[in-house]
Amino acid sequence: IDCGSGLPRLAPRLAPDPAAAADVLVLLTHFHLDHLMGLPGLSLLYRAGTRLQIAAAAATESAGTVASVLRTLLGAPLWPVDFAQLPAQVDCQDLAPASGDRPLRRGGLEIRWAPLPHPGGCTAFRVDEPATGTSLVIATDAEWDHAPPAMLADFTRLCRHPAPCDLLLCDGQYDGQTVAARRGWGHTSWSRAATLAREVGAARLLLTHHDPEDDDATLLAREQALQAELPSAALARQGMQIDLGAGPRR
């Protein structure tokens, strides 16, 4: 899900055997550059025999379709290898604005989605593994303080059905003072995110989309304040792995 700057380091996990064909689904929450910048450096794009299905919902497409955005990103003057010249097979899919009762099924997983309140549009994805009964919801960019009630209701439904999600990974970029000064920027305070997690019934909360202006000391202090309010919560860290049947591993 998404193609940030760390994506190239994920390639060995997505396709451990360089000689074998790989079939990978990439979901894009939206088309802002911080969620796309790692895609040109993904080694799988340059490996013949690889298939990448790249999908985004119509709620994110104020700038165009998935194919039009990728052709802009992968080509002159931004990148030396043109989209049409990629050795991999890249299939672009434009999803409906919301999944409703029709999840996308892939590799034993069920994927549902709903729109988020963010400039230009954004999408929250829910991933369920019916065989284990585990689930997560990822909502990277959202300004909940001024969200339309219907959008909040749809997101709540996404988090609760078919069962309350085990993990909510969500935007908690600001503190209370900063979020007030940056109304309209499309992000949420950590305290509002904690309230949201309780409202939607998420078992655990992991905050992401940290403010680039915040250093590690600031983030650690924020995590302590967050855990005083919601002990099951934490801040996401680079390289963190989470077993949905256990706690986070650092």
What does each model-found stretch correspond to?
Residues I1-V137, D145-H146, L220-R250:
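Binuclear metal-dependent hydrolase catalytic cores
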Residues S135, E143-Q238:
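Cap/insert and terminal regions of metallo-dependent hydrolase folds
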